[in-house]
Amino acid sequence: MQEPKQTRVRYLILLMLFLVTTINYADRATISIAGSSIQKDFGLDAVTLGYIFSAFGWAYVLGQIPGGWLLDRFGSKKVYAGSIFTWSLFTLLQGYIGEFGISTAVVLLFLLRFMVGLAEAPSFPGNARIVASWFPTKERGTASAIFNSAQYFATRAVRALDGLDRLHLRLAARVHRHGRPGHCVLAHLVDGDLRAERSPAGYAAEVRSSPHGGLVDLEDSKDKKDGGPKWDYIRQLLTNRMMMGIYLGQFCINALTYFFLTWFPVYLVQERGMTILKAGIIASLPAICGFLGGVLGGVISDTLLRRGNSLSVARKTPIVCGMVLSMSMIICNYVDADWMVVCFMALAFFGKAIGALGWAVVSDTSPKQIAGLSGGLFNTFGNLSSISTPIIIGYIIAATGVSKWRWSSWVPTHSFAAISYLFIVGEINRIELKGVTDEPATTAHPGELLPTTRKV
């Protein structure tokens, strides 16, 4: 029998994930660049602005577990397509709020942003689910790092572009610019297919080109027919030491991202006296370093794995080293020059990005029956920082009147992330659920190479 020709379909899939994630984060970052103007125009204090910044996070967190359940119930393609369509629609609708009075416009803006948060909820669990299906273990770190690094690419683009547009002058143009690309990507998604089973020969070639790989068939589960995963599965994840360590680590890692997406541009304008245009450009520089660090972290992890190191060593080494490097942000408390603040912020963001391998770890550990739900639970913990970080910083500034203390909060936060992976997570393995009603989680597609499993 002729050997199927090796394909590169998975790289096209990865490109699609990168583009979707870029659009996802571009929408999240749009409001922060105008934060200083919003605060001035509406007479808001720091605490109130912090709550406004966290509004998206409330909806996003609330939607994680339902979004993950939908992925497991209906599959990646349908839910992913519906998510992109819905959040792009609500983003486009924000362009029309200028037709209303100020009070009504503000209410509508945040209602629409709330809906965008709900609609975007399945995106990252969907990404992790797709990566687990298409990429072998020894490529999964790089693949996860690439789609995750899209957040830095998006932030760099938004900071530079939105520095040219004031929120109260060009809101319609801005949201239309961010909403339309989502529908373009959606068209390609619907035309294609995220499931490997559509091309059996191509799937076999992908498997054969993935030595010791552990591709995981996430679409073939009887849980779909049984009405979705049981809540007992969530209890098993929440009582698993490894998973709780991963969740805690992700919360700490994400905190710096949300500081950068919310308060950093405001800091540059109010404390450093920069114009919105200059702040938008300057704030994009750490994002470039974050993008490079994100990709590098995945490459380092997969290189360690290919050289014979265990999965635990390969994933934990970049995470811990990256968290240590990110603590360099504390130096910003003791320098005055703008360029030094930006340089140390860039260094910290570079380190944080190297260590942002949480989604690779989730792809390595999630039970195949509830891969979407597991990713949603992971993202729920991670994005609790999107709610708490802006609010906590607002209270720090209001209570102390010294905004530099915002830099100090990241040292214990990232210390906890490193400690969590070193002492709580333990050995990284794919977990196996108790009380599964369909075939065991280790059942493979023909030719599939099995991941390591362990009981919860």
UniProtKB/Swiss-Prot annotation:
Q: Main subcellular localization, coarse class?
A: membrane
Cellular component GO terms, alphabetically?
plasma membrane
Q: Which controlled-vocabulary keywords does the entry list?
A: Cell inner membrane, Cell membrane, Membrane, Transmembrane, Transmembrane helix, Transport
- GO molecular function list: transmembrane transporter activity
Quote the catalytic activity from the record: galactarate(in) + H(+)(in) = galactarate(out) + H(+)(out); D-glucarate(in) + H(+)(in) = D-glucarate(out) + H(+)(out)
List the subcellular locations: Cell inner membrane
- Keyword Cell inner membrane listed: yes
TM region positions: 11-31, 51-71, 78-96, 102-119, 246-266, 280-300, 317-337, 341-361, 381-401, 408-428
Protein topology in the membrane: Multi-pass membrane protein
UniProt cross-references to Pfam families, sorted A to Z: MFS_1
Q: Which NCBIfam families match?
A: 2A0114
Q: Which family does it belong to?
A: Belongs to the major facilitator superfamily. Phthalate permease family.
What is this protein's function? Probably involved in the uptake of galactarate and/or D-glucarate.
User: What protein name applies here?
Assistant: Probable galactarate/D-glucarate transporter GudP
